[in-house]
Each structure stands twice: as C-alpha cells, then as structure tokens.
Regions:
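Sec-dependent N-terminal signal peptides of Gram-positive bacterial secreted proteins and lipoproteins
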Residues: 2-23
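Active-site-adjacent loops and short helices of periplasmic peptidoglycan-processing enzymes
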Residues: 19-179
C-alpha cells in the first residue's frame, strides 16, 4: 500500500523559501525582536531577531487561555484554589472562596491580564501548576515553537521562561482559530460573573490597539521589568490577516500600527504556476484514462521583498473505476507552506466514462486513504 500511494502521488514544484530580513521599506521599530506574519500561510513578511528567545511577560497567557478553553466545561462554576490566586502583579480581583468559571478566568487573563486568573486556570485544568506547564510545553512543541520554554502560566519572570517573537506569532495564529479565544480577545470590555456570591463585574482590556485601530482583532499585552513591554496583536484588512509580535518595545502601539500599514500595503496577488496534471487510468476491459483539471487556479498572497514559499502536491488514486462523470472531483491539489496546509483544491475529470462490467471501487474511499497517508506529514491545525 505504501508503494502504491507513493507511486500515485506526485510532489511537485517546491518554490523559493522565504528569507527573514528587514528591507529598506520596513519601518524602524524600537523592539529588540519583532515579526510580522501572514496568518493564512504562516509566511514571515518581515522581522528582526525573530528567532531569538526572550522573556515575553503576560503574552504567555495566550497559551494558558488556549489550553483552558480546550479543556471543556467552560461554564461550570467552581471555587478557585486559594493558594493559586496568591500572586503578585496584575489581577482580575479573585478572592479566597470566590466562585468562577473557566470562561470568566479566560476573560480575566486576556483583558486585565490577571495573574491570579492564570494560576487558578492552571490548577483547574491540570490539578497543579507543574502539570499544566508540561501541557504548555507539549503544545508548544506541537505548534513548532522551537525557541520556547514555559516556566510560568502567567508570564511572571521565571528561570528559563521565554519564547521567540516568531514562536509567539505561531501561538497567536493557532489561538485565533479557536472561536472562543477570538471572541474574547477582541473585546475592549466584558461583563463577567464571579465572586462569593458571584456578581457581574466589568473587565477592561489592557490592549489599547483595539481602540486605536478598528481593524485590530486582539491579542495580548505583557510587561515585566525583565521582559519590557511585549505585545502580540492581529489585524484584518481586505480579507487578509496579519499577526505582529514585538518583544521589549517601548513604543509598541505605534510600531504595530506602522508595521501593519507596511505589511498590508506590500501584499499582492500571487497567481501560482500549476504543475503538470497527469492522466489517471480507468480500470476495466477497455482500458482508458481520464485527464484531470483544476476548475479555478489558486490565487495566493505574496509579500513585497519576500519570495513565495508555497508548495503544491498532486494527490490522485492509482486508478479510477467507471462510471466517471465529467467534472467529478477525483483528486486533490494540496497547497502547503512547510507543514501548514493552505488550500485543498479539487481535481476534476475532464471526460465522461461509462460504467463497465466490474464492480466499482468508490473513488472517495481511495482518496480518503491517500489523505490519511498525507495527514502524517502535514499540520492541519
């Protein structure tokens, strides 16, 4: 089976890989490290020291919130752990004996950046903070965050705790795919219920970009003496989404605005050159073959000064069985950037083949086998 699959799937046209650089057009920023990332493809638009591990303060809470949201039972009330909420720094106002929900804790982390909320969430999800840190680091590895170590659920300074700007952009990209996360982090204010007994309170977001620019959709601020001002944000304009990360940046609000103006202005359509599409044999006494075609060629996004890094892979079964209808999807053109799938486009039959005497094998079953095989190599998160 492995040999068959290898024989009928054609990996084609690996294009230029991106070069991480700061060109003359990129705005000057105050950050010690920054990156601007295309959320669709994962491609770096620009950056500097983007792979350098640095403390990232409360932007850490992006991971804490994501894992909390994924743990389920978000609206079940429980009493906060009294030890966990005894912490320094910013707070959502939790007190011993308070009843809260995981959803309220997530709002408390993303808006007022509550360290008490982060610690309480870690214990609620994993039973103890050390177990939760293991979860954070496992998920970081899954996301390809190769320059990251989580040693604190809140982002308070801890030995070894840090991440690169690029890693934090990858994390934000994954988190924004969670609908609950995306809904909370874009709010300038939220009403949440907690306390002893619970009552409604208003939480205010520390992310001033949300008020400065209505195209900004999140994500998280951070500050400690060691980390300086840290900011992870995302913005959407004209159907495109960019993620910006600055670490140790005294002028972060203005720098993010300038980088977004640059990034969105440098976007341009990239009509991707198609690979040669083979014919697929049709099984039966009267052997024949079907040529495949793509109904609509992909038009992707390229960024000025950054070579495209897209790859295309043709996924086709070793044979087809009649009947084959003209225009019927019989394969897939897989568009990827590294291990990230950008698009799955149907490859269709260009002719009609009538049924022969043999019992047909469903085409979609063959395609499912091929897709399962390729799932091993590509990240569909």
């Amino acid at each position: 089976m492995m040999r068959k699959l290898a024989a009928v799937t054609a990996a084609v046209t690996v294009l230029c890989m991106p070069v991480l650089r700061v060109s003359a057009d990129v705005p000057e920023v105050s950050a010690k490290a920054f990156v601007l990332l295309d959320a669709q493809s994962g491609q770096v638009v620009c950056g500097d020291h983007a792979e350098e591990k640095r403390p990232m303060a409360s932007t850490t809470k992006i991971m804490t919130v994501l894992l909390t949201l994924e743990s389920g039972e978000l609206d079940r009330p429980f009493t906060v752990d009294s030890e966990a909420i005894r912490t320094e720094g910013s707070s959502m106002g939790l007190q011993e004996g308070d009843t809260v929900t995981k959803r309220a804790l997530c709002a408390g982390m993303l808006l007022p950046s509550g360290n008490d909320a982060a610690n309480a969430a870690a214990v609620a999800v994993a039973g103890e903070q050390s177990a939760f840190l293991d979860m954070m680091n496992r998920r970081a590895a899954e996301l390809g965050m190769t320059h990251t170590c989580f040693a604190s659920p809140s982002g308070l300074d801890a030995e070894g705790h840090g991440a690169s700007a690029h890693d934090m952009a990858l994390l934000a990209r994954a988190a924004l795919r969670n609908d609950d996360f995306a809904e909370i982090c874009k709010k300038q204010q939220m009403r949440v219920c907690f306390g002893n007994p619970p009552y409604l309170r208003t939480l205010t977001n520390t992310n001033k970009l949300l008020a400065m620019d209505d195209t900004v959709i999140g994500v998280k601020t951070g500050f400690t003496d060691a980390a300086g001002r840290c900011l992870v944000s995302a913005a959407e304009r004209d159907g495109r989404r960019l993620i910006c990360v600055t670490l140790s940046d005294r002028n972060d609000w203005a720098d993010h605005e300038a980088l977004y103006d640059y990034g969105f202005a440098s976007a341009q359509p990239y009509p991707m050159p198609l690979p040669e599409l083979p014919a697929v044999p049709v099984e039966g006494e009267d052997a024949d073959s079907v040529q495949v075609y793509l109904k609509a060629p992909p038009v992707l996004t390229a960024w000025r000064g950054v070579p495209p890094a897209y790859e295309m892979t043709v996924l086709l079964p070793p044979f087809l069985t009649a009947p084959v209808r003209k225009g019927e999807p019989v394969g897939t053109l897989l568009v990827t950037n590294g291990r990230t799938v950008i698009a799955e486009l149907p490859l269709c039959a260009n002719v009609e083949i009538i049924q022969n005497d043999q019992e047909p094998i469903p085409q979609n079953m063959i395609l499912r086998i091929i897709h399962a095989f390729f799932n091993v190599f590509f990240n569909y998160r």
